[in-house]
């Protein structure tokens, strides 16, 4: 099976170049949508403003269900930005001639690492170093020696699962689309495109949800 055709690949076959150009394209589209939504704010929203307000409200409600309204509002800018960026990055891969930057492990891992570092920082900042790391010991003192390494490994596995879940699903979608186009290039595969579009939104939703869940668990004050 050959390489996935991309328009940017006509300029250079370098993997880093293709990855960076698609990532910058996703960032540019996200910034353009935000600018369009804020360029002519109205009391009764219409057009792009209406879509963006509905999106922000949905993200806030999701966060409220996970960690309460106050905390959800605090982290709304971060989670909403991640969701918008990841969603657009995923959707780019649905368009023939483009490849989702989330289909590159470098992108998915960097994004997951950023979330991992930030929620640990927030947990330490809000609870203190000792109290934050104490929850890795478990509730039974005589099992501390056993639970601590297990909890540490489990904690770092979040980084792996968060990055590989996004990368694996999006990369698989790209391969699926390539196979469909190879088997039936003369027929517009509407059903696969609809499915891939749904999956693009779903993966962005899952990434946002997990970000809220990890933030919520990091800042929660628990007594052991």
From Swiss-Prot:
TM ranges are 17-37, 78-98, 104-124, 136-156, 176-196, 201-221
Predominant location category: membrane
Q: Which keywords are on file for this protein?
A: ATP synthesis, Cell inner membrane, Cell membrane, CF(0), Hydrogen ion transport, Ion transport, Membrane, Transmembrane, Transmembrane helix, Transport
Q: Which InterPro entries does UniProt cross-reference here?
A: ATP_syn_F0_a_bact/chloroplast, ATP_synth_F0_asu, ATP_synth_F0_asu_AS, F0_ATP_A_sf
Q: What GO molecular function annotation could you give as one example from this UniProt entry?
A: proton-transporting ATP synthase activity, rotational mechanism
Q: Which GO terms describe its cellular component?
A: plasma membrane; proton-transporting ATP synthase complex
Q: Where is this gene product found?
A: Cell inner membrane
Q: How does it sit in the membrane?
A: Multi-pass membrane protein
Share an example GO biological-process annotation for this protein. Answer: proton motive force-driven plasma membrane ATP synthesis
Output the CDD domains linked to this UniProt entry. Answer: ATP-synt_Fo_a_6
What function does this protein fulfil? Key component of the proton channel; it plays a direct role in the translocation of protons across the membrane.
Q: Which family does the record assign?
A: Belongs to the ATPase A chain family.
Fetch the PANTHER family from UniProt: ATP SYNTHASE SUBUNIT A, CHLOROPLASTIC
Q: How does it assemble?
A: F-type ATPases have 2 components, CF(1) - the catalytic core - and CF(0) - the membrane proton channel. CF(1) has five subunits: alpha(3), beta(3), gamma(1), delta(1), epsilon(1). CF(0) has three main subunits: a(1), b(2) and c(9-12). The alpha and beta chains form an alternating ring which encloses part of the gamma chain. CF(1) is attached to CF(0) by a central stalk formed by the gamma and epsilon chains, while a peripheral stalk is formed by the delta and b chains.
Protein name per the record:
ATP synthase subunit a
Give the source species. Sulfurimonas denitrificans (strain ATCC 33889 / DSM 1251)
| Name of the gene | atpB
């Amino acid at each position: 099976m050959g390489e996935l055709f991309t328009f940017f690949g006509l300029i250079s076959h370098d993997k880093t170049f293709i990855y960076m150009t698609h990532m910058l394209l996703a960032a540019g589209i996200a910034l353009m949508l935000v600018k369009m939504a804020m360029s002519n704010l109205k009391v009764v929203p219409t057009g792009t403003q209406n879509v963006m307000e509905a999106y922000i409200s949905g993200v806030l409600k999701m966060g409220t269900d996970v960690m309460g309204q106050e905390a959800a509002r605090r982290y709304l800018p971060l989670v909403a930005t991640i969701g918008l960026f990841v969603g657009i990055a995923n959707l780019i891969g649905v368009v023939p001639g483009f490849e989702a930057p989330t289909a590159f492990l470098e992108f998915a891992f960097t994004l997951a690492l950023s979330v991992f570092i930030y929620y640990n920082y927030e947990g330490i900042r809000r609870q203190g170093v000792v109290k934050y790391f104490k929850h890795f010991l478990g509730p039974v003192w005589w099992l501390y020696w056993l639970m601590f390494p297990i909890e540490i490994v489990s904690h770092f596995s979040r980084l792996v699962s968060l990055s590989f879940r996004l990368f694996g699903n999006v990369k698989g979608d790209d391969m699926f689309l390539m196979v469909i186009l190879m088997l039936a290039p003369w027929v517009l595969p509407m059903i696969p495109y609809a499915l891939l579009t749904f999956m693009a939104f779903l993966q962005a939703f899952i990434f946002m949800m997990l970000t809220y869940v990890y933030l919520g668990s990091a800042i929660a004050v628990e007594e052991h």
